[in-house]
From Swiss-Prot:
It comes from Streptococcus sanguinis (strain SK36). PROSITE patterns: GATB (PS01234). It catalyses: L-glutamyl-tRNA(Gln) + L-glutamine + ATP + H2O = L-glutaminyl-tRNA(Gln) + L-glutamate + ADP + phosphate + H(+); L-aspartyl-tRNA(Asn) + L-glutamine + ATP + H2O = L-asparaginyl-tRNA(Asn) + L-glutamate + ADP + phosphate + 2 H(+). The gene is gatB. One of its GO terms (molecular function) is ATP binding. Belongs to the GatB/GatE family. GatB subfamily. This is Aspartyl/glutamyl-tRNA(Asn/Gln) amidotransferase subunit B. One of its GO terms (biological process) is translation.
Amino acid sequence: MNFETVIGLEVHVELKTNSKIFSPAPAHFGEDPNANTNIIDWSFPGVLPVMNKGVIDYGIKAALALNMDIHQKMHFDRKNYFYPDNPKAYQISQFDEPIGYNGWIEIELEDGTTKKIRIERAHLEEDAGKNTHGSDGYSYVDLNRQGVPLIEIVSEADMRSPEEAYAYLTALKEIIQYTGISDVKMEEGSMRVDANISIRPYGQEEFGTKTELKNLNSFNFVRKGLAFEEKRQAEILRSGGQIRQETRRYDEATGETLLMRVKEGSADYRYFPEPDLPIFEIEDAWIEQVRSSLPAFPKERRAKYVGDYGLSDYDAKQLTATKAVSDFFEAALAAGGDAKAVSNWLQGEVAQYLNAEGKTISEIELTPENLTEMIALIADGTISSKIAKKVFVHLAKNGGSAKEYVQKAGLIQISDPAQLLPIIQEVFANNEKAINDYKGGNKNAAKSLIGQLMKATKGQANPQVAQKLLNEELEKL
């Protein structure tokens, strides 16, 4: 029997606000345990939550970016459960009226076609703290994360393979990152994924019993965990067994999923409206104000890069993978840069440098204007491509004008024959063996001589001019 896989994803995105959702405590990552807390986070008796308006702004922005309808009368609910990292014994979330609903995004499939994935809802909530289990036998609670604002984005069960789930996450991350509401760094926990997967015989409309997967710390692990789970479920059904509704975790070491617990239903949380927060009315003017702040998204930019600038689909995808690089590219073009040349530098030397340094393009000193100026120096013959690499590293570390640095460092390319000819004669005089080899018919000796010429000029000789002059002088021998 052949089965069809059915996948839905729940993605928690940490919102990049300065303070928490219901308290004024900082919402920064990486501080000492319990440094970013106050009496609201600790749930002292009598304290009340105060809504952070910026969180609603970000919620509206996410909903619009994901083509969602917005609940203009929005309220919060209590989700009741006990755990040490949850001092109130309940989480403030949204249950029946999330801020966004009925949305969709498009994903690109492996064959180049696109597919629309529906999004059921996006709701705002507070994050829980973090438990750490020490080797000394004690468990420690860090409430820095308690109250950090989240938006949970719940897709419909529209994905039919682990590859489609991977494509959905990639597209979703790009869109969220472009809005600026989150840095979506899985390694820091600002984007977390739970996956729901079931299988059913082909042609059957009713969904099978689903399993929820957790501990999915990268998109690749999502894909691997889903691939293992669809195989596990198929083997159970083919052997006459039944799938249990349960929560399982992905084991990175073995590539398997392991049972955590039997899955709870929403009734177990005893949701009811949050009595300490009012109903929030989101007026049309508020929505339109947020809409006006939305940037052009990757799909739109890629179409422009291919259609207007003549770049390949591959180049367009690489340049729009992050908003920072895409913005840099567009600023460089606005400064007069050539699209293909700027694209080549961003995907080549710049990308290599960023990877080696572990930085983003926003964290180095290079500006779009400086890069454009440097590329112009290559185009007009002032510097060679080889020298440009040295110039780029200087600009990345120190910033400043490419032209001024080239002049100050004495890196201007030597293209004047009157300057090059005496150096060529000196190279000939110091390399008699290569000259004799050339006279004897070994034309490869010329390569050695051009190498010596470049060495003598510290790489500043114009390669094309130098090669032409050297060949002419060799013919005179």
